[in-house]
């Protein structure tokens, strides 16, 4: 029986810091093994993907039995559609409030609400107007406001649906 705290993650690929082909290959191998473990144990995964969208998606595709959430999602709309079709959730941080968040608006307008989660990624990713400051949970309302504006909803509606999605994901609903 799965307990609400049982999951695999945070796992994934972060090419921002890994520059050599050897480092990246090693990271891919570990990520693949971690998804294999999630598949074997039938546990959801929390995936970190920074500057490694193609490789991350390819490895996830190789594990069709795994579901979970891509945290701090920054991929494309096309990749979002693939992930949602495979049963994944997408979580967004304060970076959706940034002026240079070019991909996020289209994704957030398209994304089925039952696949949406919000997070702080504290202490990083503080939303505007707090960008550059230490992020904390009080700031998540700014991200919810951004989603609400894009979707024609109220902030309360966005907060309610993302709270419910989080409870379901973590098995505490």
Indicate where each model-derived feature is located.
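Catalytic metal-binding/acid-base residues of hydrolase active sites
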Residues: 12-14, 89, 97, 123, ...
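Non-membrane alpha-helical structural segments and their capping/turn regions in soluble enzymes
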Residues: 21-32, 50, 134-141, 156, ...
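Catalytic pocket-lining loop regions of alpha/beta-barrel enzymes
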Residues: 24-117
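Short, small-residue-biased leader/transition segments that mark boundaries at the very start
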Residues: 1-4
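Mid-to-C-terminal alpha-helical segments outside catalytic/metal-binding sites
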Residues: 37, 139-173
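Divalent metal-coordination and catalytic microenvironments
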Residues: 10, 38, 71, 83, ...
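Short acidic/histidine-rich active-site segments
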Residues: 114-136
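A short acidic, helix-capping loop that chelates divalent metal ions and anchors anionic groups
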Residues: 14-21, 125-130
């Amino acid at each position: 029986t799965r307990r609400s705290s049982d999951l695999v993650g945070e796992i994934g690929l972060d090419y921002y810091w890994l520059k050599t082909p050897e480092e990246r290959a090693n990271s891919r191998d570990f990520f693949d093994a971690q998804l294999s473990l999630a598949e074997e144990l039938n546990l959801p995964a929390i995936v970190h993907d920074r500057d490694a969208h193609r490789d991350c998606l390819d490895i996830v595709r190789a594990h069709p039995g795994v579901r979970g959430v891509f945290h701090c999602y920054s991929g494309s709309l096309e990749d979002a559609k693939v992930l949602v079709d495979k049963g994944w959730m997408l979580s967004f941080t304060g970076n959706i409030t940034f002026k240079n968040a070019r991909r996020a608006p289209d994704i957030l307008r398209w994304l089925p609400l039952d696949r949406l989660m919000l997070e702080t990624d504290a202490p990083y990713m503080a939303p505007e107007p707090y960008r550059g400051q230490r992020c904390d949970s009080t700031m998540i309302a700014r991200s919810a406001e951004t989603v609400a504006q894009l979707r024609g909803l109220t902030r309360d509606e966005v907060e309610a649906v993302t709270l419910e999605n989080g409870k379901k994901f973590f098995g505490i609903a």
